Amino acid sequence: MAGHSKWANIQHRKGRQDAKRGKLWTKIIREITVAARAGGADPDSNPRLRLAWDKATDANMPKDNVQRAIQRGAGGADGDNYEEVRYEGYGIGGAAVIVDCMTDNRTRTVAEVRHAFAKNGGNLGQEGSVAFMFKHCGQFLFAPGSSEDKVMEVALDAGAEDVITDDEGGIEVICAPADYPALRQAFEAAGLKAEVDAVIMKAQSETELTGDDAIKMQKLLDALEGLDDVQEVYTNVVFDEAQ
């Protein structure tokens, strides 16, 4: 990864997300409510709710907020009219972007997403235009200095698909989405804390942006992430370390 640092990008991304914590909580509450509505209030038997619960924990959301969201969903209030919608598009320099939304009004949402792309130098694409460039998977990223042997042993025993160590000493563990909860529990039991862990759309190749292009791309991502109906934004862009 010449020209940029994966870990600088991760810390930069986390910092921006932490700054938007209030909006993040709103998105997680919506996700919890819909997950409970679809699969019940028990996270042990509802994998989707377990994932949302874990997100809430990582975001330091109070347990009372989580429980209220579960009760609303399981009781049939709220969430009834929400549906998941995915949009695909292009950013600066043809960078690939996936936007996952949860909405009760598709017309409103697609208009807002299209406007965010157009206003910030991108454009909304057709279904399937960039999704093939990403893989749906569970991902755990351990910072440089983590024990490679210990991470690898726990990961492979728990069913990981791949363990990759980069030039900086960071470790990436990839698994099938269905295996993500088991791996997370295995790492926690072993006292291993990932810097980042989630079920994501992982870019299969990367596009590096620098200078003005990087600034413009970050504005586009911020605009998309700032939309109320947007749950997640994925891109194949990595930013120069200086950005």
Curated annotation (Swiss-Prot):
The keyword tRNA processing does not apply. GO terms for molecular function: DNA binding. One of its GO terms (cellular component) is cytosol. The keyword DNA-binding applies. Its main location: cytoplasm. InterPro entries: Integrase-like_N, TACO1_YebC-like_2nd/3rd_dom, TACO1_YebC_N, Transcrip_reg_TACO1-like, Transcrip_reg_TACO1-like_dom3, YebC-like. Residues 1-21 are annotated as: Disordered. GO terms for biological process: regulation of DNA-templated transcription. Pfam families: TACO1_YebC_N, Transcrip_reg. It is found in: Cytoplasm. Keywords: Cytoplasm, DNA-binding, Transcription, Transcription regulation. Signal peptide: none annotated. NCBIfam families: PRK00110.1, PRK12378.1, YebC/PmpR family DNA-binding transcriptional regulator. Belongs to the TACO1 family. PANTHER family: TRANSCRIPTIONAL REGULATORY PROTEIN YEBC-RELATED (PTHR12532:SF6), TRANSLATIONAL ACTIVATOR OF CYTOCHROME C OXIDASE 1 (PTHR12532). This is Probable transcriptional regulatory protein BAV2207. The lineage of its organism: Bacteria, Pseudomonadati, Pseudomonadota, Betaproteobacteria, Burkholderiales.
